Amino acid sequence: LAEAGDHVLTEVAGTPVVLLRGADGVLRAFPNVCRHRAGPLVLCSGKGAGNLRCRYHGWLYGQDGRLLAAPDMQGAAGFRVSDVRLPALRVHEWEGLVFAALDEHAPAFEQVYAGIVERIRPVDLGSMQFLRRDRWDVDCNWKVYVDNFLEGYHVPMVHPALVQAVDY
C-alpha cells in the first residue's frame, strides 16, 4: 500500500474491509459496503484505484469516503449527497504493518501493544516481504486449537524437529 491507489480487500473480524492509500498519501480503511443497499465497493486487491463505485447501483465515493454521486437520487426527498459518507475505521501503520479497528472506542494502538513494540523493534520488519497466506480449516472447537497452539509442553514429543530450532 505504498502508492496512491494501492488497495487491499480483506476481512477484519468477519467484516469486509477495503484499505486504500489515497492520492493525499493517507491510508484509510472502510467497510467494503455501500451505504445504500450494502453492495460491494471493491472486488479485489490491486493498484491504481481512483474513486470507489458501488457495483449494485453505482454510488460513487471519493478516496476519503465522501459520497460524490448517487445516480438518479437527485429528487429523493430529504436526500443530500453531502450527508453520506463511508464510516472510516481507525488505522495505524507501524513498521510496514497495518492495524485497523472496527470499534471506534477501542484502545489506541500504543495502549494495546504497549511493551510489544519495544520487544519487536530489533527485528527489521520493514525489510520483510509477504510470501503467501495459508489457511487451514480444522474440525475442532477453536479454544482447543488455540490452547494447543499456545502450549509448548507438547513440542518435544509431537514436533521433535522443532526442539532444535525453537525456544519453546
Regions found by a protein language model. Give the residues of each.
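C-terminal catalytic domain of Rieske-type non-heme iron oxygenases
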Residues: H92, L97-Y168
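Rieske [2Fe-2S] iron-sulfur-binding domain
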Residues: A2-E104, A108-E118
